[in-house]
Amino acid sequence: MARFADIDRKRRTEFFPVEEMLRRGYAAAVFKNTDLAKDDYHPYFSANGVAVIQDPPFTNGFYACWAKERTETSWGAISVWAWGASRVLDWLETVPGIDSRRVAVVGHSRGGKTALWAGATDRRFALVCANDSGCCGAKLNHVAVSMSETIRQDNNNNPHWFCRAFRQFNGRDFVLPYDQHWLAALVAPRLLYIASASGDAGAGPWGEFLTARHASPAWTLYGKDGLVEDGPYRIEVPFHVGRVGYHLRKGGHDLTLYDWSRFMDFADRHLR
């Protein structure tokens, strides 16, 4: 899942460094998330559904696949985008030369939340990489992380992302009956990578790291190592030994060549 400017490839960008991926022996595929669900709030979408290809009256095309009336627990845009990632994988399974048993799903920010959910719901993804995914992604809700976003902020700023029932936890992050390490643990025993940035206070880097740590017992159940902390928690000291990887990059809220390089290092180690 990528931004439009990165899909058209009119200029090189670290956000989607295709040249470096190819140089290292990896294929690259991307889809535009807003082709599946618009990334903005609109009363019609809130009441009737989020997955659209066409403009009103929404009577045919892709929209015809979805219920006309949303319930409190109907899925939001994050789930639609994750569903889209699985449809990309469907196609990759038909492409000669692509080993569909070794496909990673990678996302940044809201895309990181999407990647986690795609990995949790589709076990065909061999590696799940969530970059700067923050609240409702890889950041724990039950731990206070200074300046990090909250459930209320996510629901108020992006009410189309999740089901409406989730709003009952606005201002109640600490009483949510589960936490994000449960979501991360659903990837086990496959490969998981959580990435943070030191200057990305909103995503709560420490809370993201704790999710990697506290999800790891799920890998132990399979007789495998989760996060192996073979060094100090500090900037640009990646943890790659276990099947849960982590790094803290210097800088702000972005997906950079450093992040991609560490993802590929991890894949080289565990998927080659």
Residue ranges and their predicted role:
Residues R87, T94, A130-L183, G204, ...:
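Mobile cap/lid helix-loop segments that gate and shape the active-site cleft of serine hydrolases
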Residues M1-T94, G137-V143:
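Cap/lid segment of the alpha/beta-hydrolase catalytic domain
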